[in-house]
Curated annotation (Swiss-Prot):
A biological process from GO: bacterial-type flagellum-dependent swarming motility
InterPro entries (UniProt xref): DUF945 (IPR010352)
Domain of life from the UniProt record: Bacteria
One family name in Pfam for this protein: DUF945
One term of GO molecular function: protein homodimerization activity
Key words, A-Z: Cell inner membrane, Cell membrane, Membrane, Signal
Lineage: Bacteria, Pseudomonadati, Pseudomonadota, Gammaproteobacteria, Enterobacterales
Name of the protein in question: Protein YdgA
Organism from which the protein derives: Escherichia coli (strain K12)
Quaternary state and interactors: Homodimer.
Annotated membrane topology: Peripheral membrane protein
Gene of this entry: ydgA
Length: 502
């Protein structure tokens, strides 16, 4: 048989397979749209219930090799959102290349069969216009996603450079590249990426020009949805440099910032152990080197169901605040109410007897390092039925024990206070002299009130508590006696003489 005829037959056969496969995949996507939108709304309700937003779709057009549709994000009917007004929506254009070999993936030489390849861009409308203005009329971002037949997805997110300038306000952003992966149910998610630089110019409440810049922002993390409805996993965020300037003069320079958080499930997935690590390699204020710091905070034995209840109550209360314009439009009042909501829900977290550990919170300069180490064992007050009769009984309802130790090398403290004095305008010699006096005075006062000790040129405080008893720097006393050390003595105010009778 003629080889040319064979080749033509193969090409025709492949075309039939391709067309049939692409059409089937297009129909499959259509049948999954409702489920995908429902899952998106369920995820949105879980992660940001206070947003009062929902996702929907419109203008679906299915073709043989590709389809188009629009996704809308808008306020839930009858509810308010501070960013999107009723009747408004954020709209995304979705261009879908059908599988099993989407054209967009073939352009990247990706030959792995997949259900679809999707390109997402933002529609320019009343809500999104400010972003388009900052991007000089271009789409501010582009997302290219690959959806496998399993339903898992992988997305490349490209944030475009932004520039905005009006009077004394300016925003400049280099753009960034991020990768988002998710399983079909949205339970397992990972995000990584970086942005090179950013700059914000504004005017503060004192009518001063303020500028904030950052360089080399990186993030990398993953999380899964636990059985009790909350996310656990790992997250890392780092920033090479950030500067804050006022009226053209550099006020602060922060270098080498890194935050790492992780949470693990134990006890058959019912309990969470979490850890937060924060480090700052260098802090300079007005060119004065104040040193470096780090913090390791661990919270263990968190009951998963209790955490979920806390999250639900806190989110419900903060969501209710956003529905009250007199609160939502007043930042100070809103923050006050949010804090109240947090502490009102906090007792729920004590179920499971959590343990809080700080080891360490430290600050270091050229002359030494100060450190605070603390362990706090808590317990569920609901397990105690009797009403407390004393202060110790009240504390013991929630606290099993406390162990804390603070160490401050005198030389380190003196160096730190010297830098502070120089910031206040003192010359080097004067600053050292003043700092020495301040540290010696604080140390002497601490010893006088039995709050600190001085040994090996280090100011130290140690405090332990358990069962109503305090041990302060080795001296035992009751909780009431300890509190009495800080009580103000009663002032003998003479009685006001009676007004003489006329």
């Amino acid at each position: 048989m003629n080889k040319s005829l064979v080749a033509v037959g193969v090409i025709v056969a492949l075309g039939v397979v391709w067309t049939g496969g692409a059409w089937y995949t297009g129909k499959k996507i259509e049948t999954h749209l409702e489920d995908m939108v429902a899952q998106a709304n369920a995820q949105l309700k879980l992660t940001a219930p206070e947003s009062n937003l929902e996702v929907s779709y419109q203008n679906y057009h299915r073709g043989v090799f590709s389809s188009q549709l629009q996704l809308l994000v808008k306020p839930i009917a009858g509810k308010e959102n501070p960013w999107i007004k009723s009747g408004q929506s954020v709209i995304f254009n979705e261009s879908v290349d059908h599988g099993p070999f989407p054209l967009a993936q073939l352009k990247k030489l990706n030959l792995i069969p997949s259900m679809a390849s999707i390109q997402t861009t933002l529609v320019n409308n009343e809500v999104s216009k400010p972003l388009f203005d900052m991007a000089k009329g271009e789409t501010p971002f582009e997302i290219n996603s690959r959806i496998g037949y399993s339903g898992d997805s992988s997305s490349d997110i490209s944030l475009k450079p932004l520039n905005y300038e009006q009077k004394d306000e300016k925003v400049a952003f280099s753009g960034g590249e991020f990768q988002l992966n998710a399983d079909r149910d949205g339970k397992a998610i990972s995000l990584s990426g970086e942005a090179q630089s950013g700059r914000i110019d504004a005017v503060n409440e004192y009518n001063q020009k303020v500028q904030l810049t950052f360089n080399n922002l990186k993030t990398d993390g993953s999380s899964t949805l636990a059985s009790f409805g909350e996310r656990v996993g790992n997250q890392k965020l780092s920033l090479e440099k950030m500067t804050i300037s006022v009226e053209g003069k550099e006020l602060a320079l922060l270098e080498g910032m890194e935050i790492s958080g992780k949470s693990d499930l134990v006890n058959d997935g019912k309990t969470i152990n979490s850890q937060l690590d924060y480090s700052l390699n260098s802090l300079k204020v007005q060119n004065q080197d104040l040193g470096s710091g780090k913090l390791t905070l661990k919270v263990g034995q968190i009951d998963g169901e209790a955490w979920h209840q806390f999250s639900q109550q806190y989110n419900a209360q903060t969501q209710a605040l956003l529905a009250q314009p007199e609160i939502a439009n007043n930042p100070e009042l809103y923050q006050e109410k949010v804090t109240e909501a947090f502490f009102s829900a906090l007792p729920l977290m004590l179920k499971g007897d959590p343990v809080i550990t700080i080891a360490p919170l430290s600050w270091k300069n050229s002359q030494g390092e100060s450190a605070l180490n603390l362990s706090l064992f808590l317990k569920d007050p609901a397990t105690t039925k009797e009403a407390p009769q004393t202060l110790a009984q009240e504390v013991d309802r929630s606290v099993k024990s406390l162990d804390a130790k603070l160490t401050i090398p005198v030389d380190m403290a003196t160096e730190f206070m010297t830098q502070v004095a120089k910031l206040e305008g003192y010359q080097e010699d004067q600053a050292k002299k003043l700092a020495k006096q301040q540290v010696e005075g604080a140390s002497a006062m601490g010893q006088m009130f039995r709050l600190t000790t001085l040994q090996d040129n280090t100011i130290t405080t140690s405090l332990q508590y358990a069962n109503g008893q305090i041990t302060l720097n080795g001296q035992k006393m009751s909780l009431e006696d300890f509190v009495g050390m800080f009580a103000m003595p009663a002032l003998n105010v003479p009685a006001v003489p009676a007004i003489p009778q006329q």
